């Protein structure tokens, strides 16, 4: 059953203001912090300005692809509630979680069933699982049926070319949270 939503790739103040002050704001708002290939990438200086806004009920999420020490140090003072991490090992995520004291959304990119099974490696270090496509900046889709049978005691989020005008009923039995780009 869908319990929340995340809008990802926010990069301007007008959009951020609109969604935060909406009658039904998203539970999570994501900012692309270090993946420069994305058209939604936001420089740290701009993040400083955007994140001064009162987030009200929403949680701010730093979206990080294989983050290095440099970016983690640059954003550590920003009011992120979660770090959404792609392409790191469980050990690397554990170190980040301990050092920066952030909740973790472990992002797993999915192409086939082998990719899905990797979620078990991250159970101890993740607060929320995100199953996404391998498309990154291309917002590609993946077969969501691959994750229908997963039963875990942690929230499950799905992404992968989910659009606001999609029939969201299709995702109710799969995920707790949907990530709309």
Kindly label every feature range from the protein language model.
Residues 1-179:
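Conserved N-terminal beta1-alpha1 strand-loop-helix module at the mouth
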């Amino acid at each position: 059953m869908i319990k929340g939503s995340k809008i990802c790739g926010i990069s301007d103040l007008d959009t951020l203001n609109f969604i935060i002050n909406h009658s039904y704001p998203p539970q999570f708002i994501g900012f692309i912090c270090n993946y420069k290939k994305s058209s939604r990438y936001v420089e740290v200086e701009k993040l400083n300005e955007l994140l001064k806004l009162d987030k009200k009920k929403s949680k701010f999420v730093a979206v990080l692809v294989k983050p290095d020490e440099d970016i983690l140090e640059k954003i550590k003072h920003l009011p992120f509630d979660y770090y959404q991490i792609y392409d790191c090992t469980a050990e690397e995520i554990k170190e980040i979680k301990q050092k920066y004291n952030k909740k973790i959304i472990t992002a797993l990119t999915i192409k086939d069933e082998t990719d899905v099974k990797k979620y078990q490696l991250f159970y101890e270090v993740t607060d929320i699982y995100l199953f996404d496509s391998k498309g990154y900046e291309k917002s590609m889709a993946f077969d969501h049926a691959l994750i229908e049978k997963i039963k875990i005691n942690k929230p499950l989020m799905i992404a992968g070319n989910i659009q606001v005008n999609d029939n969201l009923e299709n995702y109710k039995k799969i995920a707790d949270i949907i990530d709309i780009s």
